[in-house]
């Protein structure tokens, strides 16, 4: 009966028969809630560490991808440059070939003219020898 009167007044006895303001059941629930909150905070901390690690990993991969992209762009530009150099060299060689063909044609014409002169001179010599 004394417990009932004290209970109505908001006072309770715990398992050690100590006088408490809170109901022992509420006290137990409060302790459990406090432990659950502590576990939750610990898990949130672990989650943040994991997420932080993942963010660092993604950042590192992004940097590596950017570096590889820049290397690829550089290689592509180098290939374009080499292709342009080869094209210019090819044009120079074609111009040189055309020049050499023209020179060859001049030499051929000159050779034919010299052959004609030689034939005329040989004919003249032959006529001169026969007249004597």
Swiss-Prot record:
UniProt GO molecular function: opsin binding; small GTPase binding
Places the protein is found: Golgi apparatus, cis-Golgi network; Cytoplasm, Cytoskeleton, Microtubule organizing center, Centrosome, Centriole; Cytoplasm, Cytoskeleton, Cilium basal body; Cell projection, Cilium
Expressed in which tissues: Expressed in almost all tissues.
Stretches of the chain forming a coiled coil according to its record: 74-114
Domain of life: Eukaryota
One CC-aspect GO term: kinociliary basal body
Keyword Cytoplasm: yes
Region (IFT57-binding): 70-132
Membrane-crossing residue ranges in chain numbering: none
GO biological process terms on file: cardiac muscle cell differentiation; centrosome localization; cilium assembly; cochlea development; establishment of epithelial cell apical/basal polarity; establishment of planar polarity; inner ear receptor cell stereocilium organization; intraciliary anterograde transport
Pfam families: IFT20
Keywords: Cell projection, Cilium, Cilium biogenesis/degradation, Coiled coil, Cytoplasm, Cytoplasmic vesicle, Cytoskeleton, Differentiation, Golgi apparatus, Spermatogenesis
Database matches in InterPro entries: FT20
Subunit structure: Component of the IFT complex B, at least composed of IFT20, IFT22, IFT25, IFT27, IFT46, IFT52, TRAF3IP1/IFT54, IFT57, IFT74, IFT80, IFT81, and IFT88. Interacts directly with IFT57 and KIF3B/Kinesin II subunit. Interacts with IFT88. Interacts with CEP83. Interacts with SPEF2 (via C-terminus). Interacts with CBL and CBLB. Interacts with TRIP11. Interacts with TTC21A. Interacts with SPATA1. Interacts with USH1G. Interacts with CCDC146. Interacts with CEP78; regulating IFT20 stability and localization.
PANTHER family: INTRAFLAGELLAR TRANSPORT PROTEIN 20 HOMOLOG (PTHR31978:SF1)
Function: Part of intraflagellar transport (IFT) particles involved in ciliary process assembly. May play a role in the trafficking of ciliary membrane proteins from the Golgi complex to the cilium. Regulates the platelet-derived growth factor receptor-alpha (PDGFRA) signaling pathway. Required for protein stability of E3 ubiquitin ligases CBL and CBLB that mediate ubiquitination and internalization of PDGFRA for proper feedback inhibition of PDGFRA signaling. Essential for male fertility. Plays an important role in spermatogenesis, particularly spermiogenesis, when germ cells form flagella.
Name of the protein: Intraflagellar transport protein 20 homolog
Gene: IFT20
